[in-house]
Amino acid sequence: MKKTIFIKNALILTVSSLILRFVGIIFKVWLAQLIGSEGIGLYQLIFSVYMLAATFATSGISTAVTRLAAEELALGTKRGTLKILRRAIEITLIVAGVTVVTVFFGAEFIAVRFLNDIRAVPALKILPLSLPFMGISSCLRGYFIARRKITPNAVSQLLEQAVRIILIVVLVGKFCTKGLGACAAAVILGDSAAEIFSFLMLWLIWLRDTRKLDNLTGRARPPFGIVRRILHISVPITSGRYLNTALRTGENILVPKNLAKYPFGGENALSQFGMIKGMALPI
């Protein structure tokens, strides 16, 4: 039985990942045709900051939730399982809140000093709005993995991608005439709205799933030290992710800056960066 569930979950993850990757490539090609290589370059710069902020917001908490919730489920305790999830959400909301304030109020500073492009400011102000929802979604995904239910995660990601594409098509079509800054902001707004939609889906599925935990009658372990246990698991994982994401963000910021030093100029440098990072590498 366990082997069958493992194979089923592995197949669901594999198929959903392939679909997401294929659809993502097709979408990137369409987006590049609409906003051009320079627009893709600007979006990639902003997206680098987005990924760094998302790494801080999620804080490697999903793995901690999966492990600790699985332990509580093995003991047959609903209260302990939900307490783990509640504490994890509290931690991720605190970290996400700090990240939201930092990025939102530091948008102009980040755009001018790091990205070297003032057009990124509107997108950077929109960017952090979805981070708390992304953090909670990460916790819920960890919970569903502990429950050995991969379908909610896969379905939410597929529908999130569908919503993202629809929203970006509509928003970019509406704002693309107002400049590349507006285009980048429209894309980030579509990304953020899709993340919020994914959270709502996972939350509704979670509400329904928790009713099935009522038959768990095991005795919960003492609640002391839950935060410490979560941090003990998540901090080592998070440290590596922070470093990896920070290095990639630094690379994406430095490449167009250095390309701009050569004769083809700043705008062409951003176009070259867009062709490399946003168009060639994804394929």
Residue spans of the language-model regions?
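Transmembrane-helix boundary and interhelical linker motifs in polytopic inner-membrane proteins
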Residues: 4, 53-90, 145-151
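Alpha-helical transmembrane segments of multi-pass membrane proteins
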Residues: 117-140
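Small-residue-rich midsections of specific transmembrane alpha-helices
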Residues: 44-69, 73, 92, 129-133, ...
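Interfacial/gating helices of multi-pass transporter permease domains
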Residues: 31-52, 180, 184-188, 228-233, ...
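Hydrophobic alpha-helical transmembrane segments
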Residues: 156-170, 178-209
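Short membrane-interface helical motifs at transmembrane helix boundaries
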Residues: 98-121
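N-terminal membrane topogenesis motif
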Residues: 1-23, 79, 83, 220-241
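Membrane-interface junctions at transmembrane-helix termini in multi-pass inner-membrane proteins
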Residues: 133-156
